[in-house]
Amino acid sequence: MDNVNLTDNFLIAMPTLEDPYFSNALVYICEHNENGALGIIVNRPIDMNLASLLEKIDIKLEAENLADMPVYFGGPVQLDRGFVLHRPIGQWQSTLAINSDVGLTSSRDVLSSVGSAGLPAEILVTLGYAGWDAGQLEEELAQNSWLTVPAKASILFDLPPEERLPAAMQKLGISFTQLSDVAGHA
């Protein structure tokens, strides 16, 4: 498991993962290195839409058609902080390039441009993120807490939240009902 970089991969929570934050979660890994990992849960909309989030932080929504866009629970770390997954990457103040097309931005300027010509074509807005210390994710993988699969931007941006986990699992050729909470080792 050493030297495995899961940046731009999905983590699929196994049934054995009893942490309520991650039960049935699909996590998009935005950064993974020797210092740890950062991911965003992408299938958990919360009871808030983009219009109400922007209103709370005094940003005018330029595009009314985006008002009902859901905001997501991104993970249990820094729940008061917003993160925006977006495509294309663009030129924002604080953007982490995940791949050549998808970025994660935590600066306010990306939200200020919602609905303007400078807005990224596709966005997913979250509050909070999932974080792992150095070696923690690798340990959880060794304990069979997660399945991994290369991510597809179309799953992030083109599917409704309830279809994202099944679509990621389909990439592995399995469905959630086929997963067991009993780990086996050959």
From Swiss-Prot:
Any Pfam family the entry gives: DUF179
A GO CC term assigned to this protein in UniProt: cytosol
InterPro entries to which the protein is assigned, alphabetical: AlgH-like
Family: Belongs to the UPF0301 (AlgH) family.
NCBIfam families: PRK00228.1-1
Annotated protein name in UniProt: UPF0301 protein Daro_3893
Source species of the chain: Dechloromonas aromatica (strain RCB)
